Amino acid sequence: MIGISVTVITEIVGLVVGLVSGYFGGAIDSVIMRVVDFIQILPQMPIIIVLTTVIPNYNAVTLVFLIAMFGWTVTARYFRSFVLSQRGRDYVLASKTSGSSNFKIMFREVLPNITSMIIIDVVLSIAGNIGIETSLSFLNYGLPSTTPSLGTLIGFANDPVNVINRPWLWLPATILLLVISLSINYVGQALQRAGDARQREN
């Protein structure tokens, strides 16, 4: 659920930012991209680890927002590139000529034309966010130890007592994590190939 929740937030924020940046271009695009560049050069994992130790009443919701705080930038840059390729198309120019507002053009004209790219990014992002949550939980900086997750189970198996007495404990969670991640990635890559083929046809 953490991976899905983070993906929902990053997709919504990244999509809106990418639409605005790619559609308007110019100074607006430059300012937004400089903010995105700054956030992307920050060390994500160390900052999240530090914040988890200083934030009071830390819980799963806090973890979701901490991961999403960095993840939206990748999504924004991804969608911006597609919007830049769409804003000069005939249907966009026709909408501007007819007097449609920028908001209407972005969300009623441009957005439907990048739907396939949104689906692909959602699928691939889920796998990545699951990996981030698992890594943090394994290091005891993710979900609280009382919250069940693949990361906490693998981290629990790493306890010295369990390593000696139950060395197999990490295996089920690790196998399940690999199966989930590989399955999601295969689906995402298949969708990406289908989307690329459709774009070439157009």
Residue ranges of predicted features:
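Transmembrane alpha-helix signature in integral membrane proteins
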Residues: 1-23, 180
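C-terminal transmembrane helix and the adjacent membrane-cytosol boundary/short C-terminal tail
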Residues: 52-55, 59-60, 64-70, 116, ...
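Generic hydrophobic transmembrane alpha-helix motif, especially the helices
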Residues: 9-13, 22-86, 117-119
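Conserved G/P- and acidic residue-centered "switch" motifs that form tight phosphate/ATP-binding loops
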Residues: 14, 18, 99, 112-114, ...
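Amphipathic cytosolic juxtamembrane alpha-helices at the membrane-cytosol interface
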Residues: 1, 5, 25-29, 33, ...
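Transmembrane alpha-helix boundary and packing residues in multipass membrane permease domains
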Residues: 19, 49-53, 67, 77, ...
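Transmembrane helix boundary and interhelical loop/hinge segments in multi-pass membrane proteins
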Residues: 82-91, 190-198
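Glycine-rich helix-loop "coupling/hinge" segments at transmembrane-helix boundaries
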Residues: 52-55, 83, 124, 132-176
